[in-house]
């Protein structure tokens, strides 16, 4: 159990470091364009020394994790690939951010694909279990597809600012194709991979939470007049499945693991303590959704003409 705790903490710290690095270098390389477009930038007004120190500290700490994992080729490769993807996306002369499809692939790989694979390999390492090829493939397709959907949505949302700043992103280069690819190619791949993951998990908990999320999404759309969005931004919207992935799926997985090994209850408790607000809000919304569904189902239907 202690090795799983170490793995979980290592994953959290290692990915946070990479995320900080990605955010800083993206702001640094976008600074001139953001100022021209009147867009907020995180490093605007900061001293160059402070920014350079932050980058150096995150890179140094990241290499420490790489050294600790040097004996695990798959884990090390995926972790280093996370940093490489972020670097290729933002830094010249590569700057894949402005190279169309290469940019969205790079961002999705750095934000979702490689961190998800790091989590898989690290969990197997901590549990001292063999890695399942089918599980790795399912997680990889799901994470990459979700990452692609996220970056396409972001670029479509930010297209006016990118135009003002002169950034030629995938959404700017292909304004008609981007929504269609995200909706009719990427999203079905994401759903198929998610279904494969749920089948391999072999527990009723994640599908049950998914059904509850669907009830909430339908009720939310009706009650608050919000629009479900796959990739195309709309006024008063919510991104389909985002809250399930961020709030409910982790809890469902931990409950599943707790049923199989009661020691995991400690990890579940730690998760609830670390992210209480998200979990509480999700539970309240789901409870309200299911209650409303039950009430509607129990009410008699008054038919008639007129």
Stretches found by the model and what they are:
Residues 13, 31-80, 167-209:
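Multi-pass membrane catalytic core of lipid/isoprenoid biosynthesis enzymes
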Residues 44-128:
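Intramembrane alpha-helical segments
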Residues 105, 206-306:
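Extended hydrophobic alpha-helices typical of membrane-associated regions
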Residues 16-18, 81-91, 142-148, 211-223, ...:
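Alpha-helical transmembrane segments and their membrane-interface exit regions
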Residues 14-42, 146-171:
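Acidic (Asp/Glu-rich) catalytic motifs at the cytosolic membrane interface
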Residues 27-28, 32, 85-100, 151, ...:
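C-terminal ends of transmembrane helices
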Residues 1-25, 73-87, 129-153:
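Membrane-embedded alpha-helical segments that form the functional core of polytopic membrane enzymes
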Residues 54-62, 107-120, 180-194, 242-252:
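Core segments of transmembrane alpha-helices
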């Amino acid at each position: 159990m202690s090795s799983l705790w170490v793995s979980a903490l290592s994953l959290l710290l290692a990915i946070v470091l990479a995320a900080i690095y990605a955010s800083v270098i993206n702001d640094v390389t976008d600074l001139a364009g953001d100022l021209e477009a009147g867009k907020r930038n995180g490093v605007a007004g900061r001293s160059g020394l402070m920014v350079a120190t932050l980058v150096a500290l995150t890179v140094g700490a990241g290499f420490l994790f790489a050294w600790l994992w040097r004996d695990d080729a798959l884990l090390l490769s995926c972790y280093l690939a996370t940093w490489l993807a972020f670097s290729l996306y933002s830094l010249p002369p590569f700057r894949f951010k402005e190279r169309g499809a290469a940019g969205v692939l790079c961002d999705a790989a750095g934000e979702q694909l490689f961190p998800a694979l790091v989590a898989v390999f690290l969990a197997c390492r901590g549990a001292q279990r063999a890695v399942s090829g089918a599980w790795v493939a399912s997680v990889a397709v799901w994470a990459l597809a979700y990452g692609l959907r996220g970056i396409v949505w972001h670029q479509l949302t930010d297209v006016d600012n990118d135009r003002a700043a002169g950034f030629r992103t995938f959404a700017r280069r292909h304004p008609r194709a981007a929504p269609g690819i995200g909706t009719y190619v990427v999203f079905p791949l994401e759903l198929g991979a998610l279904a494969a993951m749920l089948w391999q998990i072999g527990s009723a908990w994640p599908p049950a939470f998914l059904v509850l999320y669907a009830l909430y999404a339908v009720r939310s759309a009706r009650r608050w007049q919000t629009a479900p969005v796959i990739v195309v931004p709309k006024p008063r919207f919510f991104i389909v499945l985002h809250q399930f992935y961020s709030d409910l799926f982790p809890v469902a997985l931990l409950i599943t693991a707790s049923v199989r090994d009661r020691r995991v209850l400690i990890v579940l408790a730690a998760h609830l303590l670390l992210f209480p607000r998200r979990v509480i809000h999700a539970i309240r919304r789901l409870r309200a959704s299911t209650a409303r569904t039950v009430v509607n189902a129990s009410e008699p239907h008054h038919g008639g003409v007129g």
